[in-house]
Amino acid sequence: MAAYKLVLIRHGESTWNLENRFSGWYDADLSPAGHEEAKRGGQALRDAGYEFDICFTSVQKRAIRTLWTVLDAIDQMWLPVVRTWRLNERHYGGLTGLNKAETAAKHGEAQVKIWRRSYDVPPPPMEPDHPFYSNISKDRRYADLTEDQLPSCESLKDTIARALPFWNEEIVPQIKEGKRVLIAAHGNSLRGIVKHLEGLSEEAIMELNLPTGIPMVYELDKNLKPIKPMQFLGDEETVRKAMEAVAAQGKAKK
């Protein structure tokens, strides 16, 4: 018997996803298709009768707008929302803004896969002369971060290391109080939560593709261990196509 339910949703397609660029901490907005994905995700939650008590998201507009769109669809826009940089996407460092297919053609698909999918290998750092350095590192939303906290690049391991303290200290107590929690975030910060919940190996989490805009439901026991595999809310074809699209992103165009 499930003691708790947790719902995760990865933001819908962003303008930079559409252009196949490494987004990281760049604040790309949702594309029109991404907005529709978020709407469909919200409608799936509405159709299944979901209600929530508190929501968590990043400080990046593609996740925030996904959350807004979902809350609008389920008519729960009044819910409290906690935003934190700790749920941000992985910081892609010097790769930020580069087209993934062009990067694969230049560095080889194997190297791009290492940067995108290896557990503890970070991409090259974002140097001060990077075109998006000031846009990200000098943004006032990060003014309270210490030098140690503000990354110039992150591996998946680094991303999980800054997301999990927030999970443990802020989200877990809410779940254990019986609050119904919705988290709208990014592929890599959500991977960290999934890895932690399911006890996945580093290899397994690298291969996990979370679809965009599709609600993912966990039923958890009193120790916050899943009692069954993650469930997707959406028809099977939608889920399969979304996961295949995510897996194809780092491949060079033929």
From Swiss-Prot:
Enzyme Commission number(s) of this protein: 5.4.2.11, 5.4.2.4
This protein's GO CC annotations: cytosol
Name of the protein in question: Phosphoglycerate mutase 1
Function: Catalyzes the interconversion of 2-phosphoglycerate and 3-phosphoglyceratea crucial step in glycolysis, by using 2,3-bisphosphoglycerate. Also catalyzes the interconversion of (2R)-2,3-bisphosphoglycerate and (2R)-3-phospho-glyceroyl phosphate.
Origin superkingdom: Eukaryota
Keywords for the protein's UniProt record, in alphabetical order: Acetylation, Glycolysis, Hydrolase, Isomerase, Phosphoprotein
Residues bearing the modification Phosphoserine: S14, S23, S31, S118
Protein species of origin: Bos taurus (Bovine)
